[in-house]
Amino acid sequence: MKEKKYILFIVMLLMNTFTSIAQNDFDLTQRWFNETLYNPASAGNNFSTGVFLHSRLQWVGVSGAPSTHAGTFDTYVEELRSGFGLTFAADKLGSMSNYNIRLAYAFYIPIGQKSVLSLGLSGGILSRNRRLQANDSESTIDPSWAYGNVSDYSSDFDLGFEFKGPFKLGASVRHLASQPVQYNLTKHSMSIWTYLSSRFNISESLSLEPMAAVLYTESSYRAELGAIFYFLKTESKSTYSDKFWLGALYRTGNSFAVLAGMNLTSKIRLGYSFDYAIGDLSSIAKAGTHELFLSFYLNRIFYKDEVCPAYREHIRRR
């Protein structure tokens, strides 16, 4: 009951801050492995130090199609019950290039021995460059800049929460105070992303993680539904690791994706996904979308019966 009250309060707080929203952000299929890119409350949620790198080539073969390169560094400090993160992203769509760098902070509140609620905030700089073409002379940005480059930047802030226990539930409100310095290039309306997943063992060597998410955009929304099977390797009576995983993901009216990956070592893992466009895009994006991610953990151990590190520190301070 106490856990439900915490979650309900945070959800209501975030919903009340979200008014008008628009599609502005880069998209990654494998963000399920690195929520910190979209939610500051996820910084340090693996209770270790890690580096994540993503590279995405969308609609291969289509001129001006989007491409994205992104990454995070995050760590958890048990004495502070806090996670810290640094995220960056560079994506390109046609004549538009976007660059974003942020610092993220998350504070962890233990709820029992194996559940934790984190509250996060991130802030940074959003930069956008547009190479104007002849057909941009009527641009609402500034017609005098036609046939040239226009650059702009703004400060940017995100707010989020994440509950991690028998299931994972999170939400983030993005672009809380995004105002362009000179032009209208970097002005972002607020957007919100909510997600839910739960992982459970089917056998000693196999586990399943169903997941769902909703991304709200201006006057519409997009849902994601998927599942990932993890094939496990037992290290000892108390620890295990993922040997490899296979999964599938469906985005309503947008695409269908397959995901696969493996642990190259106990600290390094590699993942790949392929998105096949459906609906109106299927006729022009026949080659699909390819995405790779690489992660490196300095000190992560997977426990079968893990006690939350935030709870351990909470007990120590009593």
Predicted regions and their residues:
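Sec-dependent N-terminal signal peptides
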Residues: Y6-N16
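Positively charged n-region of N-terminal signal peptides that target proteins for export
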Residues: M1-Y6, I111-Q113
